[in-house]
């Protein structure tokens, strides 16, 4: 049984937990305290508000313990705001959070709430079926290091990438009925 934590401080927590509960041999867990970090096999940092999540990571003394676990190889997946939390650099924001993934992210790259959109894509590495994507005030990656694999582009922007044990997506798979990305992440563990 794989115990996958969802950072339970702010954002789309229950939606990720619900998706994980539908995958065999996965035990979903809402992670809130640093003492729980060593009890999980992987972690999802959900979409929400990156500034609030970053502040709460600091307030709950989670930043350094999470950074240590991720750097030691624990699989982690950041969706939307979670992508920003993982990024080493953010083009339009001086704040930094975990700084573990060799990507440069444009915060709110797709614009404001009114610019939110949905689309469907094919991505054989993740699913043989079309995958629905939901973008809400979404960031995108403007630059990756050579050790980062670009998984998906939408409108020529990088919206999904992977670096070893780290996965980052601009969109919200937890807001669709599709389990493809959650299964893909579970297979990384």
Curated annotation (Swiss-Prot):
Function (record text): Catalyzes the hydrolysis of glutamine to glutamate and ammonia as part of the biosynthesis of pyridoxal 5'-phosphate. The resulting ammonia molecule is channeled to the active site of PdxS.
Subunit structure and binding partners: In the presence of PdxS, forms a dodecamer of heterodimers. Only shows activity in the heterodimer.
Keyword annotations: Glutamine amidotransferase, Hydrolase, Lyase, Pyridoxal phosphate
Active-site residues annotated for this sequence: 80, 172, 174
SUPFAM superfamilies: Class I glutamine amidotransferase-like
Gene3D superfamilies (alphabetical): 3.40.50.880
Entry GO MF terms: glutaminase activity; pyridoxal 5'-phosphate synthase (glutamine hydrolysing) activity
Residues annotated as transmembrane: none
Functional pathway: Cofactor biosynthesis; pyridoxal 5'-phosphate biosynthesis
Protein name as catalogued: Pyridoxal 5'-phosphate synthase subunit PdxT
GO biological process: glutamine catabolic process; pyridoxal phosphate biosynthetic process; pyridoxine metabolic process
Entry annotated with the keyword Hydrolase: yes
Enzyme Commission number(s) from the entry: 4.3.3.6, 3.5.1.2
Organism lineage: Bacteria, Bacillati, Bacillota, Clostridia, Eubacteriales
Homology family: Belongs to the glutaminase PdxT/SNO family.
CC terms in the record's Gene Ontology section: cytosol; glutaminase complex
Gene behind the chain: pdxT
Classification via InterPro entries: Class_I_gatase-like (IPR029062), PdxT/SNO (IPR002161), PdxT/SNO_CS (IPR021196)
Keyword set includes rRNA-binding: no
Annotated L-glutamine binding sites: 48-50, 107, 136-137
Catalysed transformations (reactions): aldehydo-D-ribose 5-phosphate + D-glyceraldehyde 3-phosphate + L-glutamine = pyridoxal 5'-phosphate + L-glutamate + phosphate + 3 H2O + H(+); L-glutamine + H2O = L-glutamate + NH4(+)
């Amino acid at each position: 049984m794989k115990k996958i934590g969802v950072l339970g401080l702010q954002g789309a927590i229950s939606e990720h937990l619900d998706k994980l509960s539908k995958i065999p041999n996965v035990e979903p867990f809402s992670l809130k305290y640093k003492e729980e970090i060593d009890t999980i096999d992987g972690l999802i940092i959900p979409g929400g508000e990156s500034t609030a999540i970053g502040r709460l990571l600091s307030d709950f003394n989670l930043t350094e313990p999470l950074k240590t676990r991720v750097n030691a190889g624990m699989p982690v997946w950041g969706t939307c705001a979670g992508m920003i939390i993982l990024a080493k650099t953010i083009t339009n924001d001086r704040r930094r959070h975990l700084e573990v993934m060799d990507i440069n992210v444009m915060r709110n790259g797709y614009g404001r709430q009114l610019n939110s959109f949905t689309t469907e894509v094919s991505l054989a590495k993740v699913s043989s079926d079309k995958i629905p994507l939901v973008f809400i005030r979404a960031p995108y990656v403007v630059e990756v290091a050579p050790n980062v694999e670009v998984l998906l582009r939408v409108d020529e922007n990088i919206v999904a990438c992977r670096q070893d044990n780290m996965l980052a997506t601009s969109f919200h798979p937890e807001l669709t009925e599709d389990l493809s990305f959650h299964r893909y992440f579970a297979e990384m563990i």
